[in-house]
Amino acid sequence: MAVVKVNVTVDLEDDQKLKSDSLDILKLIRPGWTASDINWRVFTDGITNKLVGAWSGSDKTDTVLIRVYGFGTEKIIDRNMEMENMIKYRKLGSGSQLYATFNNGICYEFLHGDLLSQATCLLSDVYRCVARGMARLHSVPIDTCRPVMWDRLRQFIGVCSPDCRPRLQTEWWTRAELQEEASHLQKML
C-alpha cells in the first residue's frame, strides 16, 4: 500500500476538531468506514505529539493511529528520517504500516500487543524475544557510516535560546559553554 499524502492540517488544541480533521484522512485510507461507526480514543500521555486512535464499530483489530506533531518538534526530531525508518522497519517485518502523511503529522497502523512490566521482563521467553527484536533492529543496514550523534547534539543545543532559563545558566551552562563542551567531547571520543 502506497503512503497517501493528504493536504490537511489537523488541529491539536481541540479534541473535537482533532477528530473531525482526522476524519478527512480516514475517508481516504479507510473509505469503507462510516463516520457514525468510528470510535475514537485520544491518548494523553505524549509530551511532543497528540495521538488519536480510530476504529470502526467494535472491531479494534484494524485500529488506525493519527499522530499530530506538536509545535516546534521538527526542531528536535527529523520527521523525514522517522518516516523512512518506519517504512524500512516495516519491510523487515518490524513496525507499523505507514498509511498517510499530512501537513502536521502521520497516520499509521496500531500494533496490538501486551505492555511489559518489570515482572514480565524477567520471564525468559519475554526477555529472549525482546533481545531477538533488538538484535534484528540493530542489524538493519544504515545508509551512512557517519555517526549522527554529534549533529543531533549540536541541533539540541541550538534549539535552546542563548538567554534561556537564567537559572540553568547560573547553575549549569550557557549555550556557548555547551557547544564548547560538545566540541571537546567529540575530539576526545
Stretches found by the model and what they are:
Residues 25-29, 156-163, 181-188:
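Residues that form generic nucleotide/phosphate-binding pockets
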Residues 1-40:
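Juxta-kinase regulatory segment immediately upstream of eukaryotic protein kinase catalytic domains
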Residues 21, 25, 85-88, 184:
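Amphipathic alpha-helical segments that form well-ordered structural scaffolds
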Residues 31-38, 81, 89, 181-189:
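Short Pro/Gly-enriched beta-strand edge/turn motifs at strand-loop
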Residues 41-180:
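ATP-binding pocket architecture of kinase catalytic cores
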Residues 13-17, 74, 178-189:
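Amphipathic repeat-derived elements
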